[in-house]
Amino acid sequence: SALVYRGMDIGSAKPTSAELQTAPHHLIDIRAINEPYSAADFVADASRLVREIRARGRLPLIVGGTMLYAKAIREGIDEMPSTSPEVRSAVAAEGAAKGWPAMHAELAKIDPAAAERLAPNDKQRIGRALEVFRMTGKPLSHFHRKAPHPAFPMLTAALVPEDRAALHERIEERFDAMLAAGLLDEVRQLMAEPGFDANSPAMRAVGYRQAVQFFGRPHELCGISFGRHRRYASAR
């Protein structure tokens, strides 16, 4: 999902200009970093593009994507309320002050079903659930009860690495290459843009979030971000 944001090139492994010339891509560089882009936005955009590409007699390929986006495009998505930068920032500030286990306990009082699914330190999903409740007065699980509708039929394929040690070695090499290519300079430029918000959805991307958080402590960045990449790859 980070591919949609302009300026997030190195950390998202965005296709190069030469690659884009060779194989047409869509939904690249369509948002500024301070503009939200949700799974619902992705389903709407991808569905439209699939129809347009098939109308031209071509076969669309949907490549990559987080688990949320992949599930949304395969199965459809619940109709969720839109995000609010103001409420999201307020929840993030409260979580930083109280600690996310305390926020998880608050969520358990208003939405036990959602809290049961989430770890006490899953600040992104806890924050989103609290944001939804504060905006609508309804728990997040209320919206999940609505049956989703598949977006369109599709064939799903995946590559599953057999050797986890080799995978971790490749992840470490990839992250080192990103640093060598100028990831920190890229993040510094993003932080200098007007309206930059460290709590925006764009800055939740693995690597970017850690670079912003630990920008003043570069000696910690490599180990922390590499660990995040490993856990993210394992989950995917």
Model-derived regions, located:
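Phosphate/pyrophosphate-binding catalytic cores of soluble transferases and nucleic-acid-acting enzymes
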Residues: 1-236
